[in-house]
């Protein structure tokens, strides 16, 4: 980190990038499919390019490629953006994901890949908002369906799946394996709710006091 303050989103991506499941080939492939459904994947002919501003994320994607025996890739750095490019004879499509994701752990790995691919989360001190941008509406609708299976009330706008409720975001973070981030998020959420409740009580007390004063003035 070198003393540089990271965003809430970057912290979450760092945590997810360090999940130690790379020996499980099925989960690796499911997460890889999740990345491929995201908006930050660019396909030109046989060339596939993934771009991100997270160093941890680019390393994670490279590890997935290594595990899948895709060794011929190049990593480039332009300004703040990291990109990785590789060649692929047969690029997986959404139908492959639909057929492959039969088990619970694979569905979770896929959604984690979605978020690492093109997801972001606001600092909950400011507002509750998590979103993932997909390459097309079909991919967005598929992930929306998966989230509904886990009773996570996400919404969709064109090719973006988003959450605006604190409790739903917490469930989503836990689902994809962001356990440290869940604890941070919940701590901020509880403090925020307490502050809102205190403000509500103070406003209510102030309003009642004003009514009492006004009534007393009228009677005087």
Predicted feature residues:
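Short, Lys/Arg-enriched N-terminal segments with co-localized hydrophobic residues
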Residues: 1-5
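N-terminal basic/disordered segments at the start of proteins
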Residues: 6-39
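Alpha-helical structural motif
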Residues: 8, 12, 28, 57, ...
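Short, mixed-charge, low-aromatic patches
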Residues: 14-22, 96-104, 197-201
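Helix N-terminus capping/helix-initiation residues
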Residues: 24, 54, 165, 208-209
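DNA-contacting interfaces and partner/effector-binding or oligomerization modules
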Residues: 31, 38-189
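Extended mid-to-C-terminal alpha-helical interaction segments
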Residues: 177-220
């Amino acid at each position: 980190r070198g003393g540089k303050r990271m965003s809430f989103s970057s912290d979450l991506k760092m945590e997810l990038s360090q999940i130690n499941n790379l020996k499980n080939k099925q989960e690796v492939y499911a997460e890889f499919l999740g990345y491929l459904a995201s908006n930050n994947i660019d396909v030109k002919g046989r060339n596939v390019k993934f771009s991100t501003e997270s160093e941890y994320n680019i390393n994670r994607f490279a590890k997935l490629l290594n595990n899948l025996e895709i060794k011929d890739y190049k990593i480039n750095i332009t300004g703040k953006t990291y990109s990785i490019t590789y060649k692929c004879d047969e690029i997986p499509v959404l139908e492959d994901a639909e057929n492959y994701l039969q088990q619970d752990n694979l569905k979770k790995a896929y959604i984690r890949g979605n978020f690492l691919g093109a997801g972001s989360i606001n600092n909950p001190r400011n507002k509750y908002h998590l979103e993932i941008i997909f390459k097309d509406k079909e991919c967005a609708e598929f992930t929306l369906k998966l989230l509904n299976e886990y009773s996570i009330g996400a919404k969709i706008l064109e090719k973006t799946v988003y959450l605006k409720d604190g409790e739903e975001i917490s469930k989503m973070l836990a689902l994809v394996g962001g356990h440290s981030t869940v604890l941070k998020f919940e701590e901020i959420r509880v403090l925020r709710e307490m502050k809102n409740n205190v403000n509500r009580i103070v406003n209510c007390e102030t309003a009642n006091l004003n009514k009492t004063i006004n009534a007393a003035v009228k009677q005087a």
